[in-house]
Amino acid sequence: MRTIFIKLLIIILPVACLVAITNYRVDPANIFSSSEYIGGIAEILSKGHNVDNLTNYDERLLQEQMVKRLHKSPDIAVLGSSRIMEIGSDFFPGKSVLNCGVSHGGIRDLVAITGLLDSLGRLPGEVVIGLDPYMIGKGGSSEWESLSAYYGSFLHKIRKTGNRDYDHGSPIFSRKLSSFFSLDYFKSSIDFVARRHSKRYLDVGAGIPLSGRFSDGTISYPDTYRNPDTLKVALDAGITGLKNGLPQPDSVSMGLLNELLDFLQQRRIVIRFVMTPYHPEFYAAINERQPLLFHYYETFVKELGVKRNIPVTGGFDADSLGIPRSQFYDMYHCSKAALVKIFRESDN
């Protein structure tokens, strides 16, 4: 029995070492090199330069590194999910803007990023908040935990209770440990090398990134994403809407939103709500599957705006806003041209 064990060990150990070394060295998702990778990106952005050729990275940790490198508070901070990540300095001429949008962003992201800005003394004079059903509905991503220390610090400050050092660092450690010997990650690493992909980001100065970030934090999507097959997008939007629906309203998330608004308004920070439209086929499918749910969310945002004297821009219905189907990257994201139209008509 002992001999068999030793033979198995002789076979397994080299394979395990090969997997671990490959995963660590190639690291296509920047699981092990996240700090160095993100720090380099933030350093370029802090110079007022744009950065290109970005691969997988933790967008929340990038926000932290960007804010840490700010020399002064921005005039405007844009908070929300990826649906607002193209709203930048060109929307507000003459003002400094920091886009703090993150993919799959929820209310806890807004709280954590506000806690980050406050902790580092970089609260802006104005905040633009992108609100939608996924922001204040049930469920959502746990990605906000990358900034859990700031989330906990913020709640401790406003509630005067709880743990100010609230931290969920263990999931990050667990992810690193599991990825070290993961065969799936090994496969991704081999595929990354075989396709000759590169993790080398580029400082393009004032040039337009093909797939990266502008110096104000806004995203530069690749051409293939900005110019999709519109028929396929429409088909996918309808199918997904009928299949998945929208999350139901969440009283806890709505409560957090109100606590956040209290904090901002007590500090006389100007607030503006933004609702960006969904693809018309997705909107129609949701109304068929969950009648009046979109209407509920839009009414909630508008009434909250009236109650708190906060202006509201946009809406969820693309047709009512005059946004054509051709101005959607996918079912969730309208184009920058559509965003410009929404802001322009709101300001007139």
Which residues fall in each region the model found?
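Well-ordered, non-membrane alpha-helical segments in soluble/globular domains
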Residues: 110-113, 251-258, 290-301
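Active-site segments of SGNH/GDSL-like serine hydrolases
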Residues: 263-289
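Secreted/periplasmic serine-hydrolase-like ester/acetyl group-modifying domain
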Residues: 144-267
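Short extracytoplasmic
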Residues: 42-72
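Membrane-embedded segments
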Residues: 70-164
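C-terminal regions of proteins
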Residues: 289-348
